[in-house]
Amino acid sequence: SPRARSPGPRGFGLFEHPVLAAFYRRHGPAPFAPNPFPQRPPFRVLAESVVAQQLSTRAAARLAERLFRLVPPTPKAFLEAPLDLLRQAGLSRAKALALKDLAAKAEEGLLDGLDRLEDEAVVERLTRVRGVGLWTAEMFLMFGLGRPDVWPVRDLGLRRAAARLFGVAPEALPAFGEAFRPYRSHLAWYLWRSLSSP
């Protein structure tokens, strides 16, 4: 059952809260370790994260779909694609240049072996890419590597959900998350799900 795969409703306080327990029942296990999580090509996950910067989830998904119809989500294809083609998909110049730099660095091996590195080392490596900051690296840790304990306190959706459900101000989010170590990615995922729940 999903509950058996959960990182222990009894093992940490996440599901002791009635609101979070309800989200767990509705949405099932979060897609991070130790639960099964999708294995996806690192370049594609990062490209999607760059596209998603400062956009709503829905707008980002539409833009990524349009982009990948024009340019396949591989480093080689993005290296060869003219900048104008990336702009034609609806990307800002800054995002188009970031994706070109990501493609070049991926071809040089920057994305190799990330799954063997600690979270901090992954962030350090990824933020060498133009236009990739802490938020984009955190999204990759979660959705590219399935890391269970990422707490992206700068994320606007997370801030909105935490304020709505728990009355937590943005500056209090780091301390609020401490109680949920080592499964803060799971907490973030349920908070995001809450934004699309009645």
Which sequence ranges carry the predicted segments?
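Catalytic DNA-binding helix-loop module of base-excision-repair DNA glycosylases/AP lyases
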Residues: V51, E118-A162
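C-terminal end-helix/capping segment
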Residues: R154-E178
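Mid-sequence acidic-hydrophobic segments that form the walls
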Residues: L70, L102-G109, R125, V129, ...
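A short linear-motif detector with a strong N-terminal bias
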Residues: T57, A77-F78, V129, F166-E171
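Short, structured loop/turn "capping" segments at alpha-beta junctions
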Residues: G109-G113, L134-T136, W151, A169
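Glycine-centered helix-boundary capping/hinge motifs
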Residues: G90, G131, G146, F166-G167, ...
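N-terminal polyanion-binding entry modules of DNA glycosylases/AP lyases
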Residues: S1-L117, A121, A175-P198
